Amino acid sequence: KVLSQNLNKDQKKDFCITHFFNPVRYMGLLEIVKNEDNDLNKINQLKEFCEVELGKGAIVCNDTPGFLGNRVGVYAMQIAMTEAFKMKLSVEEADAIFGRPMGIPKTGVFGLYDLIGIDLMADVLKSFIKELPKSDEFHEVAKEIPLVKKLIETGYTGRKGKGGFYRMKKTDSGKIMEAINLETGEYSTSQKIDIKSDKVDLKALINRNDKYGDYAWSVLSKIIKYASSLVPGITKEFNDIDEAMRLGFNWAK
């Protein structure tokens, strides 16, 4: 709406947004953001071109904050983070669960935060808070976390900074990976969490009678609930959400 506000009605018919996910060379998702004045035949032609000629997975969505992929993806990251704090999990435990066992890349949530940039994620959250209505559940997971604020203030912004939730420490015997304690803010040697992810399917994971099962179900159920609430506001098809997460965030399930 902002980009097209000075266009006349005929111009608006031919105006839409194409949002490529980074890195463009590797990520398959391309969001085509339409407006209420668009000629749908032209939108469909553009979609076909993007799929056939560019080899992208093109999804048509409405003009809403974050479009489709980031709206769900950022919410998922935030709920995974806030639940880890709430349930007193370690960053390694959270990433071991909110990772391959759930069909999500092994970076999990805290590893992904470090990869994107903790400071950049803070800016993304501010944008969502500003643009989304107060009734949107996103506000509940976008509240400032003191430890995250401290990391940014001290230059621990992720891989591009001095470290983040994880950091590499140089020792006489070489480099070791350390992880931050979410309660104390202190770093210690990162621990490998073995939940036999190669043998645990999603159903078995959420049915576990332990903190890992509780965490997995709490996160998954909230993501599904939130994603479902976005239909038909962002898209008319539930399958579009699945495709956006598969192509834009490499979710396999």
Q: Model features per residue range: what roles?
A:
Residues 1-253:
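N-terminal glycine-rich phosphate-binding loop for ADP-containing cofactors
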